[in-house]
Amino acid sequence: MLTIEMDNFNLGQICRSGQCFRMDQIGDDRYRVIAGDKYLELTQERGIVNFSCPEEDFIFFWIRYFDLDCDYSEYINMINPRDKYLTAAGEMGSGIRILQQDLWEMIISFLISQQNNITRIKKCIENISREFGVRKTSSTGAEYYAFPTAEALALATEEQLRECNLGYRAKYVLDTARKVCFGDISLNSLHDMTYKAARKELLGLYGVGEKVADCICLFGLHQLDAFPVDTHIRQALDAHYKRGFPNRRYKGCRGVMQQYIFYYELMK
């Protein structure tokens, strides 16, 4: 177990921020994260966080995953103090971080997210992981299922995916998995693209609209200018930014501000 003291890090806020569907609270101040084929249990008491994982995994995977090298107080300090709404949102969600998650997992997760609530999204992802992922055992003895590879999903049938409660989204997942396997879309190339270029490429995938493309850019490519607009965000923009969100002021971190707003609207 590794014990780290840090600021602007709150497991509860991250878990409820809508960006990660395989993070769950499993006890008082205790959380579990499955990312790709990795497993982690964490506890937090104020600013003290305990990571139950090998030190090697923490250094080479979880530091990047939780964006621990970034000082999020700088984002909070960027908020215009005259913007009372965003100031309140930043204060409420000051422990949120933009997780650096696996691109493939984010593409499939946000395809599944369409017209879905968080509970159902999590269940769908758990279903496909159990059906098509590899069963594994963590260093602490916990059994879990890795997120399925593109190859595993490409070999599935639409009916099998529908049996995982994906509904009409099954055809989106199957089409995307096969495009990745056949080389019609390169995940590595997406990592090298600008936000605008990556967004345009993602919009070419079957079933991907603007919100889903922006979610993938923000949470799968860590492109912090992406600003996904769902119902919660649209309502906030209409109520508090009738002249439009101040994009120029927050250039380079619009996605961080989006998360503060999303969490604030969700928790009000």
Predicted feature residues:
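HhH-family (HhH-GPD) DNA N-glycosylase catalytic core used in base-excision repair
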Residues: 1-268
